[in-house]
Structures are given as structure tokens and as C-alpha cells.
């Protein structure tokens, strides 16, 4: 039996699903993205969205900063970079792009979460806090008091 046949017989990891907030994304080659998510039940996740930059991609318009989406991914057996298979937009938070201050505050909040949350560990309280903060910023200008409250 060849190595490919043995590999094909290995059990596949079950697809996982979660509601997630997109906190970071990078280009990968000409057509793909590496996307970082904050989820309540799986912590911080890194996924690769293959072909996401193609015009007819199923991910078109669904993978932008601060978006909340219901995602599905296939876990990797070799690394912490999983394969994104689905993304259904839940909350685009378009108001965050209305002013530089809102965008800056949202970026600060997501970077704080990225620094303090453990990879692939359940963190529902941080996911909820970030979601509420981004929802508030979607319709309000940031204040020093709001930033301090988030930090506390």
C-alpha cells in the first residue's frame, strides 16, 4: 500500500462551526487570504480562505475587518492554520468605516483581544466583549471613557 493510499484512509477531522469576528487578514499568494478570527467557543483561530480574492469566490464581500460571520472550517492536522470552508455574514458593521476615529478604536480593541486571548481555547467573555464594543462603535464616536471601560 502506497503512502497516498494510507493517507487517504486516515479519518478526516470533522468540520467545525462557530460565530466569529474577523480581527486580522493577510494576503496569501495571488488569490487567497489568511484570516484571523475571535470565536467564543474556539478562541482565536487562523484560517486560510483559498481563492477568496477571486471575483466569483463564495467569500467575496464576506471577509473584511470587524465583520461578524458564521464560519465553518476544516481543522488542520499539521498546524494551527485551518481551512475556511464557509462564511455567512451576520454583522458587517459598516458604520465603523464612517470615521477614522471609529476605525482606529475598533483596530485597537481587536489588537488588545489578539494580545490577551489564548489560541484555540474557549473565551466567550472576550468574544462577547469585543462584539458589544464593535456594535457600540458602529453607531457612536469613541470616547476615552469607552476605551478605558474596554481595557478594564
Q: Would you name each region that the model predicts?
A:
Residues 2-152:
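Non-catalytic alpha-helical scaffolds and adjoining flexible linkers that form interface surfaces
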Amino acid at each position: 500500500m502506497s503512502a497516498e493510499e494510507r493517507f487517504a484512509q486516515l479519518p478526516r477531522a470533522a468540520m467545525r462551526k462557530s460565530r466569529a469576528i474577523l480581527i486580522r487578514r493577510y494576503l496569501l499568494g495571488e488569490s487567497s487570504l489568511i484570516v484571523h478570527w475571535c470565536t467564543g467557543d474556539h478562541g482565536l483561530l487562523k484560517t486560510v480562505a483559498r481563492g477568496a480574492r477571486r471575483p466569483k469566490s463564495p467569500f467575496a464581500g464576506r471577509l473584511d475587518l470587524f465583520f461578524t460571520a458564521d464560519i465553518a472550517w476544516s481543522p488542520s492536522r499539521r498546524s494551527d492554520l485551518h481551512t475556511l470552508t464557509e462564511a455567512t455574514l451576520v454583522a458587517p458593521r459598516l458604520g465603523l468605516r464612517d470615521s477614522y476615529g471609529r476605525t482606529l478604536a475598533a483596530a485597537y480593541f481587536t489588537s488588545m483581544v489578539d494580545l490577551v486571548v489564548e489560541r484555540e481555547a474557549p473565551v466567550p467573555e472576550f468574544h462577547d466583549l469585543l462584539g458589544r464594543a464593535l456594535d457600540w462603535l458602529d453607531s457612536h464616536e469613541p470616547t476615552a471613557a469607552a476605551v478605558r471601560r474596554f481595557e478594564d
